[in-house]
Amino acid sequence: MVHFVGAGPGAPDLITRRGAALLQKADCIIYAGSLVNPALLGLAKADCAIYNSAEMTLEQVLDVMRQMEAAGKITVRLHTGDPCLYGAIREQMDVLDAEGIPYDDTPGVSSFCGAAAALNAEYTLPTVSQTVIITRMEGRTPVPEKEKLASLAAHGATMVIFLSIGLVDKVQQALLEGGAYTPDTPAAVVYKVTWPEEKTVRCTVGTLAESVHAAGITKTALIVAGGFLGRNYERSKLYDPAFTTEFRKGTDQ
């Protein structure tokens, strides 16, 4: 059996209870060593086989899974954040499906949630944004033409940009090209979300690249942009005294 487990954004205590329990009983852990906090490996049994997938190819990862399955062992494939976002798990699951190897998925806390917590921010504010766009800048891995950053930026929604801090100058240019954001639109960067060395940088879209370079941030950071970081919004209807819900009669009745 293979268990795909989300490790969370960094802090070891942000892994789910289910994920921690699976690590404790695993016979083999294959972890994304470039981003997963190695402190989580302290949950492993003394005789657990541990592999760092940052040093492996997909074929090598799958070979380990096959060997463990043939021996009747439990494998945990430990991915950073939540594996459903930029986790490269589909290509693993398709092979497991084809070979009849059972597996399941345990979600984790994504770094974009951790970034909001670090900023004490809410991505969806009434009259500001009810949409969150999660994307990345095109680099060595291309993006579909219709998903170019400038096209997505045209919506003016809350933007969360993964895997792009090394291209921050191009990110800033694309955000402004979209037309909905101005140089004064609030933005922020969160480095190593929830790790001890976490750092937040607040800026605007117009000063994004300059601020990132000044902070010396070159990797392992999220970029967020949008009016949700500003001061203006309307209170929610849900807790408005005049608003009737299934559980409470409002003054509008």
Predicted regions and their residues:
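Flexible, active-site-adjacent loop/turn segments at secondary-structure boundaries
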Residues: 12-13, 38, 83-84, 107, ...
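Class I S-adenosyl-L-methionine
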Residues: 1-109, 114
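A contiguous loop/helix-start segment that scaffolds small-molecule binding in enzyme catalytic cores
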Residues: 2, 60, 71-75, 131, ...
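Short secondary-structure transition/capping segments
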Residues: 43-44, 63-64, 116-120, 136-137, ...
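A generic local structural motif
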Residues: 13-18, 37-38, 62-63, 120-121, ...
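Class I SAM-dependent methyltransferase SAM-binding "motif I" and its flanking Rossmann-like core
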Residues: 84-155, 199-202
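Short secondary-structure boundary/capping segments
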Residues: 20, 42, 67, 124-125, ...
